[in-house]
Amino acid sequence: MRKLAIASIRVYQYAISPMMASHCRFYPSCSCYALEAIETHGLLRGGWLSLRRLGRCHPWNPGGYDPVPTHNTSNSSPMAE
């Protein structure tokens, strides 16, 4: 299942994304973030992190540098802030 998710993202990156204007608000791009998140954290947690990232990608968010969290950090932990 993990390989299928990664393959789907790669197809998007190489076949669909080049036809669209590059306008991702974040670095790395959302598709690169999703790949790294799934490769680092697995399909379940990586997929959740990717969905949260896509939810933040809208015109009212300034964007910027947003790396995939490491294994020993959590976005929901008050200590990580």
From Swiss-Prot:
Keywords: Cell inner membrane, Cell membrane, Membrane. Residues 70-81 have a biased composition (Polar residues). This is Putative membrane protein insertion efficiency factor. Belongs to the UPF0161 family. Its main location: membrane. It is found in: Cell inner membrane. Residues 60-81 are annotated as: Disordered. InterPro entries: Membr_insert_effic_factor_YidD (IPR002696). GO terms for cellular component: plasma membrane. Could be involved in insertion of integral membrane proteins into the membrane. PANTHER family: MEMBRANE PROTEIN INSERTION EFFICIENCY FACTOR-RELATED. It is a peripheral membrane protein. It comes from Stutzerimonas stutzeri (strain A1501) (Pseudomonas stutzeri). NCBIfam families: membrane protein insertion efficiency factor YidD.
